[in-house]
Amino acid sequence: MVESARELVVVMTHGADHELSSVAFTIANGGMTAGLKVSVFLTSAAVDLVRKKGMEHTVVPPLEPLASLVADFLKRGGRLWACTPCVKARGYEQNDLIAGVEIAGSSKIHELIKAGAATLSF
């Protein structure tokens, strides 16, 4: 069983056009710094973030550029999942997405939540 204080699941629905996408990854990275194992599940417009070049120009001062936040998240071992139906609805395939993204259903987060993971939604 997962220790509830050690796992965090962040569910994102906002894309590159909304500041909450940058806020979510800032908080996810902060969770990792605090010692949490963090997973981000992208759904709806958030799936567009991880399309290659999908977040190149998204900067919300004073936060780091979104592309840097996501790269840091992945480099530090964060798990990044893109909702299967949302990816398919947009006509994307795995090779359309940045490296490190896994196309997955919501069962990935349900397993963690059932085991006691904390959740945040943006």
Q: Which sequence ranges carry the predicted segments?
A:
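Anion (oxyanion) recognition and catalysis
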Residues: 32, 74, 113-114
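C-terminal structural segments of small proteins and small subunits
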Residues: 90-115, 120-121
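Histidine-anchored nucleotide/phosphate-binding helix
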Residues: 21-36, 40
